[in-house]
């Protein structure tokens, strides 16, 4: 006989959340806000240029980073004024007029490190949206912009961070789609508060 959990029983839900998924999910707004704080501190200032960018290239492996790239491409491809390209490795044509976002959760992924190395060598402006550690950090040290997650959550819950980085980068390059990342964080927090374990299911 399978055990059942009353979804209106907050204590039972929290007790059943052995891997901390509920807490990790509730941190989505905080992840977005952390990106907003980094931007306010000037993290993306090196992206600004008088020269028009040719393309934004989103390089990622599998997982939430790839999902974020697909969401951004689908949601903004008809809005932004420059191409948004998703890839699993740095394109051979990348150059000084391009912006590359290297997104992932594994700082030891050799494909991401190789993309950083190639992008910086060819003069592209490179943003790393991944943990600031290991080979990936070494490959971008002093040559790439780091927007590493300031809050660590399980990889399956890092989508909010990747989306916030992508939206922020696009906003710097195209003022017509510039998002208010802090407002987005507030909206996400509001959604989380409406879906906490302490609220009745059908409210």
Task: Please state what every model-predicted region is.
Residues 15-25, 34-46, 155, 169-203:
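Active-site phosphate/pyrophosphate-binding segments
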Residues 51-193:
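Glycine-rich phosphate-binding loops that contact phosphosugars or nucleotide phosphates
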């Amino acid at each position: 006989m399978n055990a059942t959990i009353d979804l209106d029983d907050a204590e039972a839900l929290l007790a059943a959340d052995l891997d901390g998924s509920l807490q990790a999910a509730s941190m989505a707004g905080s992840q977005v806000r952390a990106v907003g704080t980094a931007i306010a501190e000037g993290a993306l200032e090196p992206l600004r240029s008088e020269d028009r960018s040719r393309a934004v290239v989103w390089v990622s492996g599998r997982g939430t980073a790839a999902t974020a790239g697909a969401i951004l491409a689908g949601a903004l491809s008809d809005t932004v004024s420059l191409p948004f390209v998703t890839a699993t490795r740095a394109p051979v044509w990348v150059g000084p007029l391009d912006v590359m976002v290297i997104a992932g959760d594994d700082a030891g992924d050799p494909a991401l490190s190789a993309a950083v190395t190639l992008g910086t060598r060819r003069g592209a402006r490179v943003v790393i949206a991944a943990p600031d550690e290991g080979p990936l950090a070494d490959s971008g040290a002093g040559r790439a912009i780091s927007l590493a997650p300031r809050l660590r959550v399980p990889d399956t819950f890092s989508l909010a961070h990747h989306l916030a980085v992508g939206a922020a980068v696009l906003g710097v390059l195209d003022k017509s789609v510039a998002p208010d990342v802090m407002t987005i964080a507030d909206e996400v927090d509001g959604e989380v508060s409406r879906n906490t374990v302490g609220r009745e299911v059908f409210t």
